[in-house]
Amino acid sequence: MSSAYQNKMVNFLDGAVVDSSPIVSIFEGRSSAKAFRQALKKSKALYMSAGTLMELSIIFIGQKSAAGTQLLDEFLEKFNIHIEPLNIQMVMHGRYGCANYGKGHNPASLNMGDLFSYALAKQMNLPLFFEGLDCPRTDIQDAMQMLSYAFDDKHSPNVPPLTDE
């Protein structure tokens, strides 16, 4: 885990990277959807790799036809998610992630879509919003964990964060 965020619990994040999995969770109405909607609002700035946007666009077109991208774009605008273009530093972080956490190299088994999010989180030194068992097996800080969310056995947030309220 990133030493800047290790074991740090906060009420709000200065910034975070968003993987495709929380957005898919929200649109599919999974049990984790409410937790992700709530948590995304607790970050001052949200970022997404252009590669992740392409991945989501393919998913949305496949599930909802070409009109699906309009729903996706509206969601990104509503949550003010900034799209970051791919650059050489991200490629280098992605290569590192693939060699150390990619399919066939580590139980994390990051796929290409995961690696776009991994690379951006590494480049920006920010935690990552994600769902699933892949990213917890990497050196990326978990944004949901930082916000004190609990998880089920598949690393889906399922309990509202602990609060003093």
Where are these regions (language model features)?
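Short beta-strand scaffold positions
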Residues: 18, 47-48, 85, 112, ...
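Acidic, PIN/NYN-like endoribonuclease modules and their adjacent C-terminal/linker elements
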Residues: 1-11, 118, 122-165
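Short active-site oxyanion
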Residues: 13, 42-46, 80-82, 122-127
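Active-site-proximal, substrate-binding regions of enzyme catalytic domains
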Residues: 55-92, 96-97, 105
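A generic structural signal for short hydrophobic patches within well-formed alpha-helices
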Residues: 23-24, 53, 135-136
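Active-site neighborhoods of divalent-metal-dependent phosphate/nucleic-acid chemistry enzymes
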Residues: 2-3, 82-127
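Short, well-structured N-terminal submotif of metal-dependent ribonuclease cores
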Residues: 1-48, 61-74
